[in-house]
């Protein structure tokens, strides 16, 4: 029987059955809605153990944290309809101090299964590491099955308190001022032995206890420690008591004192790592050095995933690994455990803190390659997670160990039947953006991009991806779609991509003149309604001759649109359309962009792009002054700003600047 907790709100029994039936025949399922938990009963105990090992602390539900799966057994008064009495604590032996002896705990079983992998990872660090010591620490972590499920509160408050606040304040003042001798301090400490455990968590009492451990002799400190040690973990997580607990550990000097502290803290070490004050108490034990401080690293390896995903636990692990009292073997044990559990730690912000430290600040060799080897089998889950995908991307762009990048890219793009890439691209939240980020990063070799694009195209076609907001950028990058240039105004054909920037500017300017002429100059009867600037014919390559095309700006006879009797304008040079606005033309040819007045004749046998009309003017940026005289024709009048909104901005250069429009 399994007790499943931390389920998403509204989880149905059918979803639980579908999840757990993969590991054996499910007998019964009870949903405990108020607690978001469930009870799953298997026909055989072996199926329950397999399911527990496979699903415990795993994020099996989308957009939800890991679920907790524990073995349970029916209580003595269990009946099929009595759900509240159906489950008792996991099969274990409990004591009155909250310590549970569980030989089949999840941490021990996981550590036992990964024992060989941890030793192999430690060997590949290529450092002076004694693997026999690492193996002995793993065995010790598995054998020490006394694990506390909770930290019981300190001793109950005494009904009659011998020392009041004023008395405690006076004792502390006299000790600080040197008024008491060491013998007098020890006499006071002996008189307070019965209350020393309670005083350790008191606002004033904890400072007095600190003074006792600082000034008393070792026999007196051992006598006080024997009374405090059973409650040292509870004192260590108290906002006042944590200072006394840290002081007690810091001044411990004899083997007996250290052994007492280790004995009573070891079952609570994992819980201390989770606490904001307790994690500092655990770190204080590092000063005991090897082998007395080994229990800290054994607990980290046994509960690596749980501690690494907690806020204070992840930072405590990092601090312990950076401590000078940690040996290479102890560091290798914990770092190897982090690598083995990296696919779970990467989905958590606190776990990512550890992995980032491992990559950026650790001195272990081959760490990038070892991480890549482990994560290569979990790409379908890490690449579809917003946080974990950043770790994969960091490994791909690693320059220290190129093997890690090649391994991840191979498993990402060339998996069997494209299963990994298909799973990633089907995840619309993270997958497509992650793949686009990978193939567009400069460090990816261009020699591989063509193959990557082919694989991505094939997968996108197989999953019937549409060019929507999710897949648009990726499809454009691999060449499945092209950016279409739509005209900004109706009736104006978009210029071809082969037209240079000057031709595109000419098209915009002429189009704006044609469409805005009615509002600027009034209704003109002779103005044609055809597009002012037709697009370049795509079937005619540049540099070749073509037949005259009616209405095409690129090649048209000069005399096609010239009306008889129309005043002739000097067009020896191409006229700036801004200046041509004020020319004396009749309605039949006034500002008609199709007119030959604004075209240059094309020599036979050669097709050229239109030159953008220009004029050179010396501008005088003085209010009310003339804005320059054109040098092309003396017949053309002067031009003032404001005539054409589209061209008005170009008539305001900086003072003394030569402007070429």
Curated annotation (Swiss-Prot):
Residues bearing the modification Phosphoserine: 102, 105, 482, 486, 488, 490
- What are the residue boundaries of the RRM domain, all occurrences included? 1-74
Q: InterPro entries, from UniProt?
A: ARM-like, ARM-type_fold, Npl3_RRM1, Nucleotide-bd_a/b_plait_sf, PUM-HD, Pumilio_domain_protein, Pumilio_RNA-bd_rpt, RBD_domain_sf
Biological process (GO) annotations?
Answer: nuclear-transcribed mRNA catabolic process, deadenylation-dependent decay
Give the Gene3D superfamilies listed for this entry: 3.30.70.330, Leucine-rich Repeat Variant (1.25.10.10)
Record's keyword terms, sorted = Cytoplasm, Phosphoprotein, Repeat, RNA-binding
**Which residues are reported to carry the modification Phosphothreonine?**
104
Provide the protein's localization: Cytoplasm
A GO term for molecular function: mRNA 3'-UTR AU-rich region binding
Give every PUM-HD domain span: 129-482
The Pumilio repeat ranges on this chain: 191-226, 227-263, 264-302, 374-410
Q: What is a single cellular component term in the Gene Ontology annotation? A: P-body
Q: What is this protein called?
A: Pumilio domain-containing protein C56F2.08c
